[in-house]
């Protein structure tokens, strides 16, 4: 079982994965635990092994600043890429950097978009009632810094994601 108190020693998992000869390792953790796993894994896997995770890995470079190559071959699926050339993304990134002195991650971008989603829902519903907002969600299409979002009748979000590949301390949109 994975808990905060057991997230400091991944040697058993690392060794088992290395011995199995895998080419892709799924790491479903947040950046803090992932940095521990990747630090313990460094140099043990072949150079062509990739570590795949989702947006919880955002911020991984800040967790491995002592050696950014620890994050080499980390592939993260996320709705936000700060290096996107989209005008609205670049405006958001510049404003965020000016205000906070740091590049925004997907958590900041999702929070930013959430405010505009709520605004659009309130305007469409003409109300702040939770039931009224939920009722109009399937009618909304909101374009934010994390992309264009729609919602189905069950409230599930539909939104594209980008894959970010880290190498030598740089995260770039994979495939570009």
Regions picked out by a protein language model, each given a short descriptive name:
Residues 1-176:
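Extracytosolic ligand-binding ectodomains
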